[in-house]
């Protein structure tokens, strides 16, 4: 039982990037697809935020595609996030949030830099 507790602690302690890598490993090696519950959890806060109808002031910068020139995109991700080379490379290859809760001006500046480097980026 102690081994299961240790495993649970390790899983809970994963960073977002590590969790993304774990998901990829489970899917590719073992054929385990993510549960539908994840999509429900993501949709919940968005539905709650909709009635407010206030102008959004914080944005998440999400990398959807690294494009053909990954090296320049990795450099920009490192500059924006302060991540190490391996972590930035993993983030670029996996896609996902580059920065969370950035101001509108900062998020647009990050999006512009990443797009100039060849990436496809969304602001959410």
UniProtKB/Swiss-Prot annotation:
The keyword Nucleotidyltransferase does not apply. The keyword Transmembrane does not apply. GO terms for molecular function: mRNA binding; structural constituent of ribosome. InterPro entries: Ribosomal_bL12, Ribosomal_bL12_C, Ribosomal_bL12_C/ClpS-like, Ribosomal_bL12_oligo, Ribosomal_bL12_oligo_N_sf. It comes from the Bacteria. GO terms for cellular component: cytosolic large ribosomal subunit. CDD domains: Ribosomal_L7_L12. Signal peptide: none annotated. GO terms for biological process: translation. Keywords: Ribonucleoprotein, Ribosomal protein. Belongs to the bacterial ribosomal protein bL12 family. Homodimer. Part of the ribosomal stalk of the 50S ribosomal subunit. Forms a multimeric L10(L12)X complex, where L10 forms an elongated spine to which 2 to 4 L12 dimers bind in a sequential fashion. Binds GTP-bound translation factors. Forms part of the ribosomal stalk which helps the ribosome interact with GTP-bound translation factors. Is thus essential for accurate translation. This is Large ribosomal subunit protein bL12. It comes from Cereibacter sphaeroides (strain ATCC 17025 / ATH 2.4.3). The lineage of its organism: Bacteria, Pseudomonadati, Pseudomonadota, Alphaproteobacteria, Rhodobacterales. The gene is rplL.
């Amino acid at each position: 039982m102690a081994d299961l507790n240790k495993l649970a602690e390790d899983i809970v302690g994963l960073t977002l990037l590590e969790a993304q890598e774990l998901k990829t490993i489970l899917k590719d090696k073992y054929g385990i697809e993510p549960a539908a519950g994840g999509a429900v959890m993501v949709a919940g806060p968005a539905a709650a935020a909709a009635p407010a109808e206030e102008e959004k002031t914080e944005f998440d910068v999400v990398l959807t595609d690294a494009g053909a020139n990954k090296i320049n995109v990795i450099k920009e991700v490192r500059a924006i996030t302060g991540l190490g080379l391996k972590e930035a490379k993993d983030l670029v290859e996996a896609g996902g949030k580059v920065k969370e809760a950035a101001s509108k001006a900062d998020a647009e500046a990050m999006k512009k830099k990443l797009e100039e480097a060849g990436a496809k980026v969304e602001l959410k």
